């Protein structure tokens, strides 16, 4: 049976703003308090989705979350009607309101970890929503993420949804941003590579000193168990703590995979030779080669990789069998990175084409092309069981652009978050979106 990689991109929400909430993510911190343009951000994301669909890729849309998140504000002691709750929060703690108004769910690489049916012992696709324990503004996402995923992947014969891991540091889980799958055809067995930053139950192991390690080995192992993965086809690799301290807060800022290919920086992993030997041996066991494309430090520094999000790219297999790398405009603007990319496509690797997209609104908040998408490998039967209303086509692209034009502002500053009109605008937009995408009632305000 034919297999597909389906990319589900997050639609940027109406409260997209620059709050600098993500310690360890240098772009996020640097752009704190800048004016944002939610309308432009949403349209930039939609353009990328449509362009990839036009290339023949399977492309889906994940809905933004309800923001400001009034239920959490109520848990924190703010009272009255919803508009009063938001107004009180702005008066007493604008930073807290900003945190609970973040449009961070657009970065769906952190939404969940997904294991395809070909790898799972029960032959079903498994989803575990990420608890995102390391950052308060993201730790509230898992419940809505699960609701949205269950509205898209409904059929229990094909899809299994797990609760997020316990909301403690020991099981800090950042989803697919620290997970790669290597293999051949998307419908056949692959090797799942879980990348972690720290092992909490073994304090003697190295870890970062400047910035936090957001993914723990304990979390990755728990997900592998939940997804009923075979140890013989699963690998756990530690990310180099030195690069975490240079701003590589997720593995998808320093490495990206597709099928047999792992595109990565020279300094991406700890004990890299040993890790790659295990990957190579396990790939051989499923009859596949492992192709490592390593970018040396003397061509692209870690600092340049972080600044341009070279590795926060997408590698896509085109219908003709070749691979295209999708990079942000910032990669083209950096001479060293652009020179390397153009040399790479002449090296005889499977990657033979480059596509560049302007995602500046997302990039300024610290998220590139790979942050914006959740990869789901499906066979033909499973793809036919997906809610068809979320799959990108000409009509959906037009409808969503009109929806953005109708509901989104073209500038937003932190002080705007207390505007009662913004709360009502956002809810009206999301209520309409759930009908467009056929999601049902997935938001707290709808219940």
Swiss-Prot record:
<dbReference type="Pfam" id="PF04996">
    <property type="entry name" value="AstB"/>
</dbReference>
<feature type="active site">
    <location>
        <position position="174"/>
    </location>
</feature>
<feature type="binding site">
    <location>
        <begin position="137"/>
        <end position="138"/>
    </location>
    <ligand>
        <name>substrate</name>
    </ligand>
</feature>
<feature type="binding site">
    <location>
        <position position="365"/>
    </location>
    <ligand>
        <name>substrate</name>
    </ligand>
</feature>
<dbReference type="GO" id="GO:0019545">
    <property type="term" value="P:arginine catabolic process to succinate"/>
</dbReference>
<feature type="binding site">
    <location>
        <begin position="19"/>
        <end position="28"/>
    </location>
    <ligand>
        <name>substrate</name>
    </ligand>
</feature>
<protein>
    <recommendedName>
        <fullName>N-succinylarginine dihydrolase</fullName>
        <ecNumber>3.5.3.23</ecNumber>
    </recommendedName>
</protein>
<keyword id="KW-0378">Hydrolase</keyword>
<feature type="active site" description="Nucleophile">
    <location>
        <position position="371"/>
    </location>
</feature>
<dbReference type="InterPro" id="IPR007079">
    <property type="entry name" value="SuccinylArg_d-Hdrlase_AstB"/>
</dbReference>
<comment type="pathway">
    <text>Amino-acid degradation; L-arginine degradation via AST pathway; L-glutamate and succinate from L-arginine: step 2/5.</text>
</comment>
<dbReference type="GO" id="GO:0009015">
    <property type="term" value="F:N-succinylarginine dihydrolase activity"/>
</dbReference>
<feature type="binding site">
    <location>
        <position position="252"/>
    </location>
    <ligand>
        <name>substrate</name>
    </ligand>
</feature>
<feature type="binding site">
    <location>
        <position position="110"/>
    </location>
    <ligand>
        <name>substrate</name>
    </ligand>
</feature>
<dbReference type="GO" id="GO:0019544">
    <property type="term" value="P:arginine catabolic process to glutamate"/>
</dbReference>
<comment type="subunit">
    <text>Homodimer.</text>
</comment>
<comment type="similarity">
    <text>Belongs to the succinylarginine dihydrolase family.</text>
</comment>
<dbReference type="InterPro" id="IPR037031">
    <property type="entry name" value="AstB_sf"/>
</dbReference>
<comment type="function">
    <text>Catalyzes the hydrolysis of N(2)-succinylarginine into N(2)-succinylornithine, ammonia and CO(2).</text>
</comment>
<keyword id="KW-0056">Arginine metabolism</keyword>
<feature type="binding site">
    <location>
        <position position="214"/>
    </location>
    <ligand>
        <name>substrate</name>
    </ligand>
</feature>
<feature type="active site">
    <location>
        <position position="250"/>
    </location>
</feature>
